[in-house]
Amino acid sequence: MEELLMNRFVEIFGEKGTACYFAPGRINLIGEHTDYNGGHVFPAAITLGTFGVARKRDDQKIRMFSDNFKEVGLIEFSLEDLTYSDSDDWANYPKGVLNYLIESGHNIDSGLDVLFYGTIPNGAGLSSSASIELLMGTICNDLYALHCPMLELVQIGKKVENEFIGVNSGIMDQFAVGMGEKDQAILLDTNNMHYEMVPAKLGEYTIVIMNTNKRRELADSKYNERRAECEEAVRLLQKELSIEFLGELDSETFEQYQALIGDPALIKRARHAVTENERTLLAKQALTEGDLEEFGLLLNASHRSLKEDYEVTGIELDTLVACAQEQPGVLGARMTGAGFGGCSIALVPKQNIDAFIEAVGQSYQDKIGYAADFYPASIDDGARKLF
């Protein structure tokens, strides 16, 4: 792959690239819709991601090309004008990184040429945008010798998303992409950014990512709706409880005080936030102890809660997950990401992968009318220079 990209770089830019880089995508193992509820998330970097080949220029020109968006063509802009532009399309993500690195006082004194190529399916909810942001940060850090800590690049990536692009997302995606380690999941407390690396040794099992191939049109509007519902539940609970987030409660306390919320729909939303946070902490314990069966059961329980209490799944995700859970040897499956399309994950015996993909794929095609895509993935290192 790297050699192909080095040759492709010469085709596009006419000269050899000086180095090759990679930034992964991410999955969230468990802890869904907990980040804005003051809970824990449990992401991991994966083997799918974005490759980049780059070289510095001796002028102020930035030139970017993505083999995933060939139709957009070569995108050019100047270091002296790093404002958002619709015509720059996907390149606004790396452009934003350049903008905030310079704004933070880092010395980027000349332009560069960059070729991007991603193996993350677009729109699948596996953080292709965070992957591009951290890839660009890693390229700049290396080529301009910025000595910028990864955590700062993570925060710049989030700033690009929130302020440059205008998407109201948390820090989990960039954190996982930047800080990921091979065979380690990251338990992140979204309240205070405390994190710990947890061994995720899956032994004879592998994670299969299942893409519904359903466009996530509803995700943004429903995401904002759920967020508002949780905030309202907190406001009602605050009549008797001094809490700021649902993630501060355990199930027992929640059950004791849920009558304060009144509205049955709001109770369900809040119950998911509370129980999912508990499941995430139990999942950490299960992985630490090497108890993959328990970990799988927690994945199943998470999906059930997202389906019944949080109501963010939909027929496509439910079909994939239900069928996956029925396959021989599968320990667990759940949707991952915002929901309403996107992806789910399953913990599948390595020896059964082909049979699993065939059976679940056929069942999905029969019921939904179009194909799902399947990607076996391992937990891998974060953004890095390859050579």
From Swiss-Prot:
GO terms for cellular component: cytosol. Gene3D superfamilies: 3.30.230.10, GHMP kinase, C-terminal domain. The active site is at D173 (proton acceptor). Substrate binds at E32, H33, T34, D35, Y223. Mg(2+) binds at S129, E161. Keywords: ATP-binding, Carbohydrate metabolism, Cytoplasm, Galactose metabolism, Kinase, Magnesium, Metal-binding, Nucleotide-binding, Transferase. ATP binds at S66, G123, A124, G125, L126, S127, S128, S129. Pathway: Carbohydrate metabolism; galactose metabolism. Belongs to the GHMP kinase family. GalK subfamily. This is Galactokinase. It comes from Enterococcus faecalis (strain ATCC 700802 / V583).
